[in-house]
């Protein structure tokens, strides 16, 4: 049975837009995905008919909103195959989730003489918090280097791991190169060395099924807005024994058990002690609707369609003169490229004139740009609502730019 891409596209109202007099070809979902009507409607319905502050409310609307929020926590647990919903913390997104780990678990567990291992392909969100932790603690930051083809030099991992390695933090799929890292293998090696592992799943959850128990990762984090959900909501998964031992990061309402000016404060159990203040309940409701949406389509069917679309795109882009592609042949979700000696911003601006939206810049991955010795790249994203016709428009646009600019 073929993937119902036209039916899917009909659920995304923005895809009916025109840009510069041409139909929008939105190839920027790796930055942020568009939202289907089902997500938009779910959040609107909540604000129109069901909104109230969650926790401790005796009235019906508050109790209902609290229950709906906790139902989504249970839903996310099933989506990730977590053992318990109490292993999941609602955060603003991947960046906040990583910072939470660095500032709670990291401050308690990482000390002078210890080390943290990351990779050369990481998003800044999975670099800077660890740099800051190392500066605070006196720990060392170690880096798994890249190969030119965009894969990791995994043969270097054994030499980087030792008895003082506290954490390996790695992206599951590169936001620039589309490299799908062998995270299960890396997790197993890290655990043999006694280290914990954090997986940045921001570029993975929309492309295929995630099973945190099978991966055996200690931390897993993703953002809702890349999963066709709202902005400002994400999820941090932490193995229950680790999460219950972590000290709170932010103080305020909802994360306490008792507060006394003379006796001090006691804290709620996890995950609620990591959710200070009024949560983004509307965003949580929207995230639940997004998970419903992709689950109904089936992540296996989505993965199969996207893999076919990627093969088509790579074959067609091979016909563009002076086009440099970055990353491995086997990639997921994104294609990074430059056209001749033209700056990525110029290429992206021309493509926008043709109604084709791509991302340009360093993609929050400046160490990766330094490795390839370029200031910027263009990046086209391919997801479940994209089509071969949109790929054709990208290729035609690139050929036209090459002809115009030489």
Swiss-Prot record:
Q: Name one GO biological process term.
A: cysteine metabolic process
Recorded catalytic activity of this chain's protein: (sulfur carrier)-H + L-cysteine = (sulfur carrier)-SH + L-alanine; L-selenocysteine + AH2 = hydrogenselenide + L-alanine + A + H(+)
**Pathway(s) annotated for this protein in UniProt:** Cofactor biosynthesis; iron-sulfur cluster biosynthesis
- As stated in the Swiss-Prot or TrEMBL entry, residues carrying the post-translational modification N6-(pyridoxal phosphate)lysine are 226
- Name the keywords, alphabetized: Cytoplasm, Lyase, Pyridoxal phosphate, Transferase
Q: Which GO terms describe its cellular component?
A: cytoplasm
EC no. given is 2.8.1.7, 4.4.1.16
- Provide the primary localization: cytoplasm
Q: GO MF annotations for this entry?
A: cysteine desulfurase activity; pyridoxal phosphate binding; selenocysteine lyase activity
* Alphabetized InterPro entries for the sequence: Aminotrans_V_dom (IPR000192), Aminotrans_V_PyrdxlP_BS (IPR020578), Cys_dSase_SufS (IPR010970), PyrdxlP-dep_Trfase (IPR015424), PyrdxlP-dep_Trfase_major (IPR015421), PyrdxlP-dep_Trfase_small (IPR015422)
Obligatory cofactor(s):
pyridoxal 5'-phosphate
**Which locations, inside or outside the cell, does it occupy?**
Cytoplasm
Q: What is annotated as the active site?
A: 364 (cysteine persulfide intermediate)
HAMAP family the UniProt entry points to? SufS_aminotrans_5 (MF_01831)
Query: What protein family is recorded?
Result: Belongs to the class-V pyridoxal-phosphate-dependent aminotransferase family. Csd subfamily.
Provide the assembly information. Homodimer. Interacts with SufE and the SufBCD complex composed of SufB, SufC and SufD. The interaction with SufE is required to mediate the direct transfer of the sulfur atom from the S-sulfanylcysteine.
Reported function:
Cysteine desulfurases mobilize the sulfur from L-cysteine to yield L-alanine, an essential step in sulfur metabolism for biosynthesis of a variety of sulfur-containing biomolecules. Component of the suf operon, which is activated and required under specific conditions such as oxidative stress and iron limitation. Acts as a potent selenocysteine lyase in vitro, that mobilizes selenium from L-selenocysteine. Selenocysteine lyase activity is however unsure in vivo.
Q: What is this protein called?
A: Cysteine desulfurase
Lineage of the species this protein comes from: Bacteria, Pseudomonadati, Pseudomonadota, Gammaproteobacteria, Enterobacterales
Name of the coding gene = sufS
